[in-house]
Amino acid sequence: SIKDPNTFFGSHTVNHMILTNEQTNVVKDEISKSKEIIEKETGRNILHFCYPNGNYNEGIKKIVARSYKSACTTRAGFISKGSDIYSLNRIGINEEMVTDWRGNFSKYVFMFSLFIESVRR
C-alpha cells in the first residue's frame, strides 16, 4: 500500500528516457517532474533516484544531487563505506532468491542468496 510506512518509493524519471541522450533542460524536467508526481501521489518526500537503464554522467549526477539524497545504477554489486552515493551499485532480487522449495518466503534462503552474491563479486 502507498500509505504503508514500510514501503519506500524512489524516482526514475517520467518517461524512462535515456538521460545521457537528452538535452540538459529535458533531463532536469524529467528528474524534477518524476519527483513531484510521486510526492503528490504518495504524500511523501522522495529522496532516492535510479537512473533509467543505468545511464548517467557527471552532469546528470549533479542534477540528481540537487534534489535527492542518493541514486543507484544498474551495476550489480554491494555498497561499501567509500561508495559514491550518487552511483550506488545494487543487487537485483527475484523470487528464487527469497523463497524455499514450497514457494514460501524464507529469510534463510534470502540470507544465503546474498552470501552467494557476495562471494560471486
Which role fits each region the language model picked out?
Residues 4-6, 14-17, 21-121:
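C-terminal active-site subregion of NodB/CE4 polysaccharide deacetylases
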